[in-house]
């Protein structure tokens, strides 16, 4: 390979074979077999290749003329998630802005740099945090992976390295870094890595503050080096480079006890003795009401380090689901549990009917167990176990009816046969 200085010594004037500029009009002229290319044409070719690669790695949703609007995203979430209206609106706007930034680059035509906005979801168990993240990824048709913060440790200690999160995301898209960079990562149980006290620890906390420190760069944006196909790291191995600044991170947790921290901050007229603030039980704020008043300082007191909180600028809270919401969850969403079990029974040629009092009884059981929507499936499995065991062996069953007494264990499901004969199922 040669450059323009060598050819100047021979006295021959050289030109770029692509743009026709002479060696005096460009900074560098690279020689090949009977052809020359200037540095400007090389830069132009690189830009063209980058744009082509960008277009080829966009998901179907991104490559369409327009991104789904926040309203479109919210409406899709409504089809699968009951309640949590404020959280859905916050998520819709944050996700829309994130993918708009990816499509148009980090810098606007005016030179304004667009920052990255990761999301923190705070809400009790079974309130829909994971479902919201999964539904978003499915709607946008982007790679999605989940990680459990409780299994993470600092590099060099027993446990999962934080870079394993990116490795899981790569597995979901056949180890294509460009596709992974447009994915969504949901980190659950993020509250479990809070440090033991509000003040920085002088001892090693490898599963608490140490993990927060390790996650900082990953969430903010760094070039993560991941071994291909899950191989162990060694010096001779080529790493896959993934730019995490393009990945949307959603962190979620129940944050048990955070309501007490908020209540302590917002309480007025606190004191002791005769000056104490006496509240009746009726005036006590609910956990959901307190979560709505959350401030970054509350999360610091809970045990998250300020730098970590700063990487999660979009914070939204989910409220505890009441009995009415659980009844709706059982029957209204597109993939409602009653519809799922109905489809299973339909494969056996029988219709499954849940009466209204049965849905209320299921919701009441879930409320008593304090498991939220997460506990609904286990209740239904227990109730329908005997029926699902016997039904494939029975002939002529056209309908199975579940009422409140079945949920409470007082009677067996009602079987309606094709000849209209009705009887309760019995274990034979």
UniProtKB/Swiss-Prot annotation:
Keyword ATP-binding: yes
GO molecular function annotations of the record: ATP binding; ATP hydrolysis activity; ATP-dependent protein folding chaperone; protein dimerization activity; unfolded protein binding; zinc ion binding
SMART domains in the cross-refs: AAA, ClpB_D2-small, zf-C4_ClpX
GO BP field: cell division; proteolysis involved in protein catabolic process
CDD domains named in the record: RecA-like_ClpX
Domain ClpX-type ZB: 4-57
Pfam families: AAA_2, ClpB_D2-small, zf-C4_ClpX
Binding site for Zn(2+): 16, 19, 38, 41
Keywords recorded for this protein, A-Z: ATP-binding, Chaperone, Metal-binding, Nucleotide-binding, Zinc
Binding site for ATP: 124-131
Any one annotated GO CC term: HslUV protease complex
Role description: ATP-dependent specificity component of the Clp protease. It directs the protease to specific substrates. Can perform chaperone functions in the absence of ClpP.
PANTHER family for the chain: ATP-DEPENDENT CLP PROTEASE ATP-BINDING SUBUNIT CLPX-LIKE, MITOCHONDRIAL, ATP-DEPENDENT CLP PROTEASE ATP-BINDING SUBUNIT CLPX-LIKE, MITOCHONDRIAL-RELATED
Family from the record: Belongs to the ClpX chaperone family.
Subunit note: Component of the ClpX-ClpP complex. Forms a hexameric ring that, in the presence of ATP, binds to fourteen ClpP subunits assembled into a disk-like structure with a central cavity, resembling the structure of eukaryotic proteasomes.
Name the record gives this protein: ATP-dependent Clp protease ATP-binding subunit ClpX
Gene from which the chain derives: clpX
